[in-house]
UniProtKB/Swiss-Prot annotation:
Family: Belongs to the purine/pyrimidine phosphoribosyltransferase family. PyrE subfamily.
NCBIfam families linked to this entry: pyrE
Needed co-factor(s): Mg(2+)
Domain of life: Bacteria
A GO molecular function held by the record: orotate phosphoribosyltransferase activity
EC number: 2.4.2.10
Species for this entry: Neisseria gonorrhoeae (strain NCCP11945)
Matching PROSITE patterns: PUR_PYR_PR_TRANSFER (PS00103)
Gene: pyrE
Function: Catalyzes the transfer of a ribosyl phosphate group from 5-phosphoribose 1-diphosphate to orotate, leading to the formation of orotidine monophosphate (OMP).
Subunit structure, interactors included: Homodimer.
Binding locations of 5-phospho-alpha-D-ribose 1-diphosphate: 26, 72-73, 98-99, 102, 123-131
Protein name: Orotate phosphoribosyltransferase
InterPro entries: OPRT, Or_phspho_trans_dom, PRibTrfase_dom, PRTase-like
UniProt catalytic activity: orotidine 5'-phosphate + diphosphate = orotate + 5-phospho-alpha-D-ribose 1-diphosphate
């Protein structure tokens, strides 16, 4: 049985979503890799991405009743992943929010199924955690319960303190975060594929400097 986490990283490389080299993060750090989920931008790649999300969510064991995708990136992720979960026999409703409230038609900021029960938030990454915090407020305001967060990649690096953005969400809200892959999985990919050998030491150094356990 293949490791779907490694398959996801290889797929991300093939789509140029994951790149190795020298990059500057929003925090001003020099990073040896870059991950841009926005480049999953056609039907085939979005379909495959949703399959990885569905598998990761099921294997996480998180109990949930529906999906919520925060605008804007989470909208397509929630819809596509709901379809892939249905193919695996897990048929759940989904919803998303608008950035701006609408005063006609459906109205309000929420679109899709009513937020009820245990709601799993789905997004691409957790950076500052702002999107997650806003999603939690929306979910709780509707009387529902946040169940956890599903993301594509956990960079496993410190924020302003000693914790990563993912760890801060887990600690502050007591919610599980289920990434398809993490920095540890990326490190394994580099170790097992000699063609990427030149990036092994830079990633090791970066992890030593900024990484969390």
């Amino acid at each position: 049985m293949t490791d779907f986490r490694q398959d996801f990283l290889k797929f991300s490389l093939a789509q140029n979503v994951l790149k190795f080299g020298e990059f500057t993060t929003k925090a001003g750090r020099r990073s040896p890799y870059f991950f841009n989920a926005g480049l999953f931008n056609d039907g085939a790649s979005t379909l495959q991405l949703a399959k990885f999300y569905a598998q990761s969510i099921i294997e996480s064991g998180i109990r949930f009743d529906m999906l919520f995708g925060p605008a804007y990136k989470g909208i397509i992720l929630a819809a596509a992943t709901a379809m892939m979960l249905a193919e695996k026999g897990v048929n759940v409703p989904f919803a998303y929010n608008r950035k701006e409230a609408k005063d006609r038609g459906e109205g309000g900021v929420l679109v899709g199924a009513p937020l009820k029960g245990r709601v799993l938030i789905i997004d691409d990454v957790i950076s500052a955690g702002t999107s997650v915090r806003e999603s939690i407020k929306l979910i709780e305001a509707e009387g529902a319960t946040p169940a956890g967060v599903a993301i594509a990649l956990d960079r496993m690096e410190k924020g302003t303190g000693e914790l990563s953005a993912v760890q801060e969400v887990e600690k502050q809200y007591g919610l599980p975060v289920a990434p398809i892959a993490s920095l540890n999985d990326l490190f394994i990919l580099l170790q097992n594929n000699p063609e990427f050998g030149q990036f092994l030491e830079p990633v090791r150094t970066y992890r030593r400097q900024y990484g969390v356990e």
